[in-house]
Every structure is written in structure tokens, then in C-alpha cells.
């Protein structure tokens, strides 16, 4: 929007000193926001005042000239007259107590020229800060919340009420700054469709040095001013504090005021010795419903600033200073205000030439507000007293020039990620993504740990299977060895049997002579297990028949037994018992012999080919078992290697998880802090 700077004039009431000195009011508020100067009071010379008891006669022209020529020294205390009814003289009237002074009256009225000025708003001494704020500042504060840059400035002579207008006097009569802050947070509370981020900064310009009132370190003093090709002039290193409530902002202002330079002068016991600029940076973005695209990250961000400026007042060095320090401060204040007046004058004249913004730190900092994209309101404070008539008149002239300046304010929107609000939103999204990754990693780690436990169980099972395979292998090897031994024994027995069957027996082998009766008698007497002592005795008493003539190799034991038995038919009982014992032993031996014969028969029937085939089969099974065992071993090795890799991966994941958890704790702490601040804000509003 293209509009002129809004200019208002506010007059303060007479102070105690002005009332005590009986100063006159030389300015009159009229209709249509017009202020007009009044003529000064008339002074009468002492020599022209006759005694009160002597009536004054009409004066001729000559006496008038003589009386006019006799003017010497005016009265030190001027006559007090009503503001709107100046003294009038009547040359034709006699016997009056007030002397007629046509010559001085004619001279004063001919020299006095009334001055009238019209502004946007006029505030008489009876107006309070609420009325000033509602009329001048409220609309600009709302514009700042809608994306326009705005500046509100208090300008005037010293002790004219600038600081009172901007800051007020406590909670009962707050100024423009606290009322603006209250309105900003009320607007945020009522605006549900947008989200806001507020930052504040507070600086002072003292003796042409820029100081940060919110900083306490040495690097916060004498800050440098730079210019950005897009954003314009800015103060490098100025601290910006994010705020969440009205109380938070007011506490920062209170802390900044404690660092501001103030001093006592002849005009004011607490006079501001520096210019201050309280800035609020407002970022807002439309709140989109959840699930609508990227959550509103692509919507533009409105960026605006609200500057609340309290200027130090101009003053006369001869009257205001009580020390060299105050004199120096006053000279810097007057210099900066003079430069501001020059800049305002050139801007009001639409001068396209050089504008001396750089001649003062004040005009340099205010360059964006005065000549750029900003809505500006200036509140000029004056005093109506006659002792400050010239200073008030100069202030009104400054206000008239400022009213001619036109600015083109527009809504500021940022589409990229330079806005701090969008950066915070992106950071929150990034932190949420990291948190999701951390949770996913934690879940993966849990799954890996579970898999590790399963692999341990599987490995133990494989180890048990491996041990069982080893045992089975040993068993198979033992069976093969036993079979090999049995084959060798069977072969030797077959060889011995073939030698005995050829009839070439000799008397040397007790085994062959013992086996022969069993073999020969087995055919005729059946199973040896059914032999009784009597039958065995009868067997031994039998004579060799013709069928067994070839079996002449009857053992000597049989012969001796036979002879003992024969002789025992008529012997005593002792010999009979001995014979029975021998027969019993022989029966046991025959049973053992039968078992041996059965084994020999089995081994004889078990030929070598089938044994070799069985051995090959067993060897095949053994090879298969070896292959299975090798497979188990390779699988176990693979699982051990995989388990080792998993252990390394688990260690790496645990290390990453610890880092992520540490980062997550930090993020969670920051998030908790932001949530607490947001909750405080929600509770407050």
C-alpha cells in the first residue's frame, strides 16, 4: 500500500516548574486536527505606568510619540492575561487603572504572525496512553501481524513525554510498547489458521555507538551496521531472543532498560541519554490440516518487523548540562536529530539526490523504515509552555515535513528456507525422521539379537548332531573292525577244519582229538544238550563199530573214562562219585563246544563275498556319514562365521544406537523444552 507517514502531535500538561513560573500557553488546539500559535503576552514599560491614584488623561499625538520615545526597560515579569483575550487599549477612554500603550501594542500586533499546522491526529494534555495507542498504533500493530513492516516513533524535545508515551508508567497506564505486545499475543490467540514465531531485539544508540541492551558481554557493545542487498540495513551481532508470552517480553524489556543510559539534567531527573529501538520480528505460516501433502512446509512464510522507537530529546546545551558528560551526550543527541531532520526534509521534497543516511547511526538504522517497505507513524511530543515555544515550534515543523513522506508498504513473504519458522519446521521434520530411524534401528537391533539367540540355539543343536555323528562314526568303525576280525577268525577256522577232515590227524592236537568225538557222535546221538550222565556213560562204554573205524582218534580221556567206568561196575561209592563229577564237567565242555560249533557253522556259511559286500556297504555308509559330518562341519563353520559377522554388526549397531540414543536424548531434551514453552504459551493464551 502506498501511503504517507502518519503524524500525530501530543501535548503534555504543564509540569511543576512551569506552573510555579506561571508560564503561558502559546498553542491552541482547533478543529480538524489543527494547532495554532498564539501571540506572546504584552509587556508594559515601567516609565509609562503612572501612579494608580492619578487618572490618565487622553494623550495627543505628540504626547504619544514622547511616551513611545521614553521606553527603556520592559518589566521582568510580564502581565498575565487570558489566553484568548489579549489586552486592548482605548485612547478615547479616561480614568482607567490600566495604562494605555498604543505604541507597544501596535508594534507587537504588527510583528506577530500566527502559525497553523494540521496533522493526522492531535492529542491534548487530557488524553491518556490508551487513546493514543488506539488511534495511532493499533492499526500498525495489526498490519505487522499481517506481514507489513511497521515503525512507531516518538520524537520531541527533552522532557516532553516521549518515554512516557512509549513505555508508560506501570500497569495502570501502560505505553505503546506494552500495549502492542499485549495486542500481538491476543492476535495470535485469535488467529487459529496460522502459526507464529516471535523474536525480539533491543538496542540503543549512545554517543553514536550501537549497543545491545539484551547482551551483557563486551562484544555486545559498539556493534557494526551492515547492509544486505535483499533485507536491507541490519546490525551485525545483535541478539535476538525467541519469546513465548507477554511476561517473557516484558521481562526482557525490563532487563534492557536496566542497561540503558539515563541521566539527570536541569529539565528531567531521569532523562534518556540514548535512542532506543525495540524490534519484534514476526514470522507466520498457514497451518494446513494433517495429511495434506508435506504438512504445509511449502506454504509461504510471512516475515515482518515492528520497530518501536524512543528517541532522546533535543536540548539546549547552555541550559541542560550540569557536567561535561551531559554536554557531550547532548551534542551527540542533537547531531543525530539534526541528521534525522535533514533526511526527513529531503525525503519530503521528493529529492532524488543524495540523502545523508550514513551521517548518523540513527538514520542509518532507520533507513529501511523511512524510505522503504514500511508503514510509519510518528508521534511528536511538545509542551505548550511559553518557555519552550521555539523548541515546540521546531518539532511541529519537523512533523509537517515528515507528513509529506510517502512509503510503499507491501506484504513480505518468503518462499525458500531462509525463514526461521520454516527452518524450525524442517528441523522438526528431520528430527522426527531421525527418531523414526532410531526406532527402526532399535527394532532391527532387537531382531538381530533375537536372531543371534536363535543362531546360538541352532549352533548348539548342530554341535549335538556333530557329536552324535562322531559317536555313530566311531560305532561304525568299531563294527567294521569287529567284522574284519571275525572274517580273519572264520578263515583260520575253515583252514583248521579242512585239515581235520582230510584224515591226517595227529596225536599232537588236543583240540582235534576233542572235537572228533563230538562230530562223530553228533550224527547218532542228537543234540548234546539232551545228553544225561547215564547216556553219556553208555556212549563211552560202547565199542567202536565198523562205521566209525576211521575215527580211531578217540581221545585218551574217553578211553580212560571208559576203563574207569568199566571198572566201576563193581567198585565202591567213592569211585562212583568221582565218575559223576567227571561226567558233569564233560557235559559242560560239550555245551561250550556246541556253542563254538554253532559260531563256526555261521562263519562257515558266511562267505567272503557277502562279507566284502557288507563291508563295502558299511564303508559307503561311513563315507556318507563322513560327507554328512563334513557338511555339518562346513555348516557349523559358516554359522560360526555368520555369527561372528552378526556379533560385529551387533557391536556396530549397538555403538550407533548409543550415539543415536545420545542424540535422541539431546533432541528429546530440546523438544521437551520447546513443548514446555509451547504449553506455557497455550496456558497463557
From Swiss-Prot:
Residues 411-488, 574-683 form a coiled coil. Its main location: cytoplasm. GO terms for molecular function: ATP binding; ATP hydrolysis activity; microtubule binding; microtubule motor activity. SMART domains: KISc (SM00129). GO terms for biological process: microtubule-based movement. Keywords: ATP-binding, Coiled coil, Cytoplasm, Cytoskeleton, Microtubule, Motor protein, Nucleotide-binding, Transport. ATP binds at residues 156-163. GO terms for cellular component: cytoplasm; kinesin complex; microtubule; microtubule plus-end; spindle microtubule. Residues 511-520 have a biased composition (Polar residues). It comes from the Eukaryota. Belongs to the TRAFAC class myosin-kinesin ATPase superfamily. Kinesin family. Microtubule-associated force-producing protein that plays a role in organelle transport. Its motor activity is directed toward the microtubule's plus end. This is Kinesin-related protein 11. It comes from Dictyostelium discoideum (Social amoeba). The gene is kif11.
Amino acid at each position: 500500500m502506498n501511503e504517507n507517514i502518519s503524524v500525530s502531535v501530543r501535548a503534555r500538561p504543564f509540569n511543576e516548574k512551569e506552573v510555579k513560573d506561571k508560564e503561558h500557553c502559546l498553542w491552541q488546539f482547533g478543529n480538524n486536527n489543527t494547532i495554532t500559535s498564539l501571540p506572546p503576552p504584552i509587556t508594559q514599560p515601567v516609565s509609562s505606568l503612572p501612579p494608580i491614584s492619578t487618572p490618565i488623561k487622553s494623550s495627543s499625538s505628540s504626547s504619544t510619540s514622547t511616551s513611545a520615545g521614553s521606553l527603556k526597560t520592559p518589566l521582568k515579569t510580564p502581565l498575565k492575561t487570558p489566553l484568548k483575550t489579549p489586552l486592548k487599549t482605548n485612547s478615547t477612554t479616561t480614568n482607567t487603572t490600566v495604562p494605555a500603550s498604543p505604541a507597544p501594542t501596535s508594534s507587537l500586533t504588527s510583528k506577530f504572525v500566527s502559525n497553523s499546522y494540521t496533522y493526522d491526529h492531535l492529542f491534548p494534555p487530557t488524553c491518556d496512553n490508551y487513546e493514543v495507542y488506539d488511534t495511532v498504533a493499533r492499526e500498525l500493530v495489526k498490519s505487522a501481524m499481517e506481514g507489513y513492516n511497521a515503525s512507531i516513533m516518538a520524537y520531541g524535545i527533552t522532557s516532553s513525554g516521549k518515554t512516557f508515551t512509549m513505555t508508560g508508567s506501570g500497569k495502570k497506564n501502560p505505553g505503546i510498547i506494552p500495549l502492542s505486545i499485549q495486542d500481538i499475543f491476543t492476535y495470535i490467540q485469535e488467529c487459529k489458521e496460522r502459526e507464529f514465531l516471535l523474536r525480539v531485539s533491543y538496542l540503543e544508540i549512545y554517543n553514536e555507538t550501537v549497543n545491545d541492551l539484551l547482551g551483557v558481554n563486551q562484544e555486545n557493545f559498539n556493534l557494526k551496521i551492515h547492509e544486505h542487498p535483499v533485507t536491507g540495513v541490519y546490525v551485525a551481532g545483535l541478539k535476538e531472543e525467541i519469546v513465548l508470552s507477554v511476561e517473557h517480553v516484558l521481562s526482557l524489556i525490563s532487563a534492557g532498560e536496566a542497561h540503558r543510559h539515563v541521566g539527570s539534567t536541569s529539565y528531567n531527573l531521569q532523562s534518556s541519554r540514548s535512542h532506543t529501538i525495540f524490534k519484534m520480528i514476526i514470522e507466520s505460516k498457514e497451518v494446513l490440516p494433517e495429511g495434506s501433502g508435506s504438512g504445509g512446509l511449502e506454504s509461504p512464510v510471512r516475515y515482518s518487523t515492528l520497530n518501536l522507537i524512543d528517541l532522546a530529546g533535543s536540548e539546549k546545551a547552555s541550559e541542560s548540562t550540569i557536567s561535561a558528560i551531559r554536554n557531550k551526550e547532548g551534542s551527540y543527541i542533537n547531531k543525530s536529530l539534526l541528521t534525522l531532520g535533514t533526511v526527513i526534509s529531503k525525503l519530503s521534497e521528493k529529492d532524488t539526490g543524495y540523502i545523508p543516511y550514513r551521517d548518523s547511526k540513527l538514520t542509518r538504522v532507520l533507513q529501511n523504515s523511512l524510505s522503504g517497505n514500511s508503514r510509519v507513524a510518528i508521534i511528536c511530543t511538545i509542551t505548550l509552555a511559553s518557555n519552550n515555544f521555539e523548541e515546540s515550534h521546531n518539532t511541529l515543523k519537523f512533523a509537517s515535513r515528515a507528513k509529506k513522506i510517502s512509503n510503499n508498504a507491501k506484504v513480505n513473504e518468503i518462499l525458500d528456507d531462509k525463514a526461521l519458522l520454516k527452518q524450525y519446521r524442517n528441523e522438526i521434520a528431520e528430527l522426527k525422521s531421525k527418531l523414526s530411524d532410531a526406532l527402526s534401528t532399535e527394532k532391527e537391533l532387537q531382531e538381530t539379537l533375537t536372531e543371534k539367540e536363535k543362531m546360538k540355539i541352532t549352533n548348539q543343536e548342530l554341535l549335538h548332531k556333530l557329536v552324535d555323528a562322531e559317536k555313530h562314526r566311531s560305532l561304525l568303525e568299531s563294527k567294521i573292525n569287529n567284522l574284519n576280525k571275525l572274517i580273519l577268525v572264520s578263515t583260520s577256522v575253515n583252514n583248521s577244519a579242512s585239515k581235520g577232515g582230510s584224515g591226517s590227524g595227529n596225536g599232537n592236537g588236543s583240540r582235534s582229538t576233542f572235537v572228533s568225538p563230538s562230530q562223530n557222535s553228533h550224527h547218532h546221538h542228537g543234540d548234546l544238550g539232551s545228553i544225561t550222565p547215564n547216556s553219556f556213560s553208555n556212549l563211552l562204554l560202547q565199542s567202536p563199530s565198523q562205521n566209525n573205524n576211521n575215527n580211531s582218534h578217540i581221545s585218551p580221556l574217553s578211553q580212560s573214562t571208559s576203563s574207569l567206568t568199566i571198572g566201576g561196575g563193581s567198585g565202591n561209592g567213592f569211585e562212583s562219585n568221582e565218575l559223576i563229577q567227571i561226567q558233569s564237567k564233560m557235559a559242560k565242555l560239550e555245551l561250550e563246544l556246541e556253542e563254538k560249533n554253532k559260531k563256526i557253522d555261521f562263519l562257515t556259511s558266511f562267505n567272503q563275498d557277502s562279507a566284502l559286500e557288507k563291508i563295502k556297504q558299511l564303508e559307503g555308509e561311513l563315507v556318507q556319514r563322513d560327507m554328512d559330518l563334513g557338511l555339518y562341519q562346513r555348516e557349523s563353520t559358516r554359522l560360526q562365521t555368520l555369527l561372528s559377522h552378526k556379533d560385529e554388526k551387533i557391536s556396530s549397531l549397538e555403538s550407533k544406537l548409543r550415539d543415536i540414543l545420545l542424540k535422541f536424548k539431546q533432541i528429546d531434551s530440546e523438544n521437551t523444552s520447546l513443548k514446555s514453552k509451547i504449553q506455557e504459551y497455550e496456558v497463557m493464551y
